[in-house]
A protein has these predicted regions:
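Short, thiol/selenol-centered motifs that function as redox-active sites or metal-ligating centers
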Residues: 62-69
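Contiguous, function-dense segments enriched for cysteine-driven chemistry
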Residues: 38-49, 54, 66, 96-99, ...
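C-terminal binding/interaction regions
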Residues: 1-27, 82-151
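Secondary-structure capping and boundary motifs in well-ordered enzyme cores
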Residues: 40, 67, 119-123
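Alpha-helical support elements that line or immediately flank enzyme active sites
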Residues: 71-83
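Alpha-helical macromolecular-interaction surfaces
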Residues: 69-70, 89
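Structured beta-strand/loop patches that form or line metal/cofactor-binding pockets in enzymes
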Residues: 19-62
Length: 151
């Protein structure tokens, strides 16, 4: 990866950490999930408003490291307006990217900013926490999601 690309990716992560998108509660959410990463201390909640099979709105709140917060912010942008199946597909491609099992070619530049995370296994949990919570919420599961035992 070129130095310019690394700088761009770092800038994207820092910007979404400082000014996260969709950092709010959806009062009339049809689904909600809580996520916890005990290793890093990340704690967040994800709200989803489904309209039939479509993610009409998605938001999050919580605290965590820059990677966790930026990933949650970008996740909300990536899945809003998508069908459940499309959102799950984006989840799968993002997880493949951060675990080094995919190149993220189909993901936008924002999500590809997390491509270097695969080199730091503990940070994979930070990057994927909001995604696991979102997947749990759209599946209608109510139990908290933990990164313990997951990638």
């Amino acid at each position: 990866m070129s130095a310019d690309l690394e700088e761009l990716y770092q800038s994207i992560i820092l910007d979404h950490n400082r000014r996260p998108q969709n950092f709010r509660v959806i009062e009339n959410a049809t689904a909600h999930a809580e996520g916890l990463n005990p290793m890093c201390g990340d704690q967040l909640q994800v709200w989803v408003q489904m309209d039939g099979d479509t993610v009409a709105d998605v938001s999050f709140q919580g605290s965590g490291c820059a990677i966790s917060k930026a990933s949650a912010s970008l996740m909300t942008q990536a899945v809003k307006g998508k069908t459940r199946a499309e959102a799950e597909g984006i989840f799968d491609r993002f997880l493949a990217l951060v675990t080094g099992k995919g190149d993220g070619a189909e993901l936008g530049t924002g999500l590809k900013a997390f491509s270097g995370v695969s080199k730091f296994p503990l940070r994979v949990k930070c990057a994927s926490l909001a995604w696991h919570a979102m997947k749990s919420a759209i599946a209608g599961k109510s139990e908290p999601v933990s990164t313990e035992g997951s990638a």
